[in-house]
Amino acid sequence: MSKRSDYLEIHPYTKSIEEWMDDMLIPEEERGQIKGADVVALPVGYNGCEKSFASSTLDFIAYARQQGLFNVEICCPEYDFTNLELCSVKIRLGKFQLATAITGTIFWGVVSSYIYDLVKPLLPQITPIEHVESPRFHDAPEVSFSIVIPDSLGNKQEIIYDGPVEGIDKVGEVIKTLTNGN
């Protein structure tokens, strides 16, 4: 059963890492690394380019690896990576599948820190202005990402967020609920 509310969507997810590796034509010699990862970046597919990754995926992976809290890999052959840049101010992290529920809160901490580090330089500039012709120009940055995580019963759930930065705390709350079984 799917749930959707203000920029946040949660629904069951059934596709396995094995199926993703088959779809992405991952060579046998690269599969072990991906299977052994705590977190796997998956393609998001935009406008007919099904094997493409979000614009900030590689930067986020580099950031996550620098933190050293979990092993992250990308589900893509080394020779075939397609990074899609879209013209907007939105931070597009992409889709990530977590191997265990335990990784969820750690991963969320890294995601929220990464987003904060990106928007921190913009925050002092974001001030409410009452009389503006185009108020969207002054809005806070937006972010989109998807996290596939096993819940406390072992069923995978996909959490999709696409909205303003100030609303991402809801995702952390959902992750805690899913992984604690509450």
Language-model segment annotations:
Residues E78-D139:
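Membrane-inserting effector segments that mediate pore formation, membrane fusion
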Residues G68-F70, T100-I102, K176-T177:
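Short, surface-exposed, polar/charged, turn-prone segments marking secondary-structure boundaries
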Residues M1-D80, S144-V171:
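Membrane-active, amphipathic/fusogenic segments and juxtamembrane/transmembrane anchors
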Residues I34, Y114-N182:
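Amphipathic, membrane-active segments
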Residues A54-S56, L86-S88, G172-K176:
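Surface-exposed beta-strand edges and their flanking turn/coil or helix-capping segments
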